[in-house]
Amino acid sequence: MSKLSILKQKNKRDVDMTQGSIFRHLITFAFPLLIGNIFQQLYNTVDTWVVGNYVSNEAFSAVGTVGPVINMLIGIFLGLSSGAGVVISQYYGAKRYDKVRDTVHTSIVMTLILAVLFTIIGIAMIPFVLNFMKTPAEVMPESSAYLTIYFAGVIGLMLYNMGAGILRAVGDSKRPFYFLVVSAVLNIILDLVFVLSLGMGVEGVAYATIISQGVSAMLTMITLFRTDSCIKVELKYLKLDKEMLAKIVRVGIPAAIQMAITAFSNVFVQSYVNYFGADCMSGWTAYSKIDQLLFLPMQSLALASTTFVGQNLGIDQVVRAKKGARTAFIMSVVATVILTIPLLIFAPQLVSFFNGKAEVVAYGSMLLRYCSPFYVFCCVNQVYSGVLRGAGNSRAPMIIMLSSFVVFRQIYLFIMANFISNTIIPIALGYPAGWLVCSTLTLLYYRHADLSKSRLVEDAEKRAEASGKSRIKAV
């Protein structure tokens, strides 16, 4: 047997969440995620800041307009990678390391196939998508250029997210954080070089983004190839395992649809916002960037709860999984309330950081002050959707979000725009209205859900592990 085929079950960076302090596991897992996501938002924010201050208002609007499209793309693949992460975390918790290995290699092959498809289909769909969003003619060329470059380099985004999801599934959120920091710093440097020094405009920002994402993907893949644990990637195992692919799809497809639905609903909202012109679009872009920062704590804790619940249900510790869910929810509420207060007080100053034009600041600060008090409701659907996904049930969150963010929100927007008040504030309040409906439905479902029923690890496999039949040996 080759040296590389005899793998350690655990690496020192892996974390077993099936025992020990729940709060400590959640905070130590979520904190690197939070800081990493802040860095990711930082370089997205720098993109926007550079364009808004050193290119043109039209370029600023162009970058803002493509935001929902980019987020929809990211959402689709985050959903698929979360499917792989849930399968890995449950088998890791159940100590079925052979199944972990099979899932890891299936996930990588799936990612490479999807990257090719996303690139081809994405570039072909750009004109249709921008026209569907009612993108103004003056920003159409720059929006199209940005999206074309982004889709051409999407493989970096996809490989990083899948690789990071694999690492997080076994409790390692630190190394994905380190790679994001490197990517963020590189992106900022390239932004300044391409836009300020070389005058490449929106295209320079897009190139900076895909290059930095490519570097983070490379670092993640090198880590997976060089690790000595059960998530090690080896060329000879790179194939699609039908059983593992079916389980990834079972969790990942509904999760991908759920995340795409959220982003797609934003495409609808963006089309309503575009109606009010470039200043409103710019104000909305600034508001959206700040909005994304506020969501980071609850999103990080939602990811932490997914891994925590996955590992604990893998070994059938349902009570501990539910305690983790409750703890993550309380933590997210506290963090969100603390962050909301400065937004209400310093809204104009925050918006002016992105664009100092008076009309843009007025729109952006108004949107912040109307919407930010409702962010606390998002903690419910963010955390408990993460819990349900960790349990292997991503279908229920998908249906709930479809009902709330597509059906309800689009009916609300249509009625507001056509029959009640065709102004920006009633349109913007479609967000809090959707959050409230989604959170109510999610909480009602969770209170009556049996988490153990959606567990992906079969009892037979658990018995096999107890009998010592795992194919991968410990060193």
Task: Report residues per predicted region.
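Short alpha-helical transmembrane segments in multi-pass integral membrane proteins
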Residues: 1-30, 88-155, 197-253, 309-374, ...
